[in-house]
């Protein structure tokens, strides 16, 4: 029961979270490529994501913009990108303000908080539902706020 001047209380079960990782990319048209898995990210996992999820969707006019995560700079990743003939760029260090995907993650995390997922096995499905909420107008706004489009 809630009332005026009473603290809102929401019960959350105490558990030890497991590490769920999402690798993702967004495009100006609202299309997202992503993969979800348990555990941390390695250069091998990132290369697999590029090979199976992102690179098959790109045209020669597309540009991949990445932050400076260590695995983005791995030799195997750079060799894969070079062999694909895709253009790729790295953001300056510590520049989340230039990365539209940071804004996408803000929206997705807000969605996940509202979903109140408490069982790890339900998280991948909730993440997929969250990606369905991303619209082209969102992406245009995020890219515009980072000065990639007018």
Which residues are covered by each model-predicted region?
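RNase H-like two-metal-ion nuclease catalytic core shared by retroviral integrases
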Residues: 67-68, 75, 89-113, 121
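Short, basic/hydrophobic alpha-helical segments
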Residues: 45-63
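Extended, low-complexity cationic-aromatic segments
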Residues: 1-51, 148
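Short alpha-helical elements
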Residues: 52-53, 65, 79, 116
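Catalytic-core regions built around general acid/base machinery
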Residues: 76-85
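C-terminal anion-handling pockets and recognition modules
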Residues: 32, 101-150
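RNase H-like polynucleotidyl transferase catalytic core
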Residues: 6-14, 84-100
């Amino acid at each position: 029961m809630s009332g005026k001047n009473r603290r809102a209380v929401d019960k959350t079960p105490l558990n030890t979270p497991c590490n769920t990782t999402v690798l993702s990319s967004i495009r100006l048209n609202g299309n997202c490529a992503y993969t979800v898995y348990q555990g941390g990210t390695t250069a091998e996992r990132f290369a697999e994501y590029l090979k199976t999820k992102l690179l098959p969707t790109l045209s020669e006019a597309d540009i991949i913009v990445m932050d400076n995560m260590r695995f983005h700079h791995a030799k195997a990743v750079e060799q894969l990108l070079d062999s694909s003939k895709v253009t790729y760029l790295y953001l300056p260090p510590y520049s989340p303000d230039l990365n539209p995907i940071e804004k996408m993650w803000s929206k997705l995390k807000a969605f996940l908080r509202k979903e109140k997922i408490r069982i790890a096995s339900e998280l991948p499905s909730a993440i997929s539902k969250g990606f369905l909420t991303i619209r082209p107008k969102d992406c245009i706004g995020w890219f515009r706020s980072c000065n990639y489009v007018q």
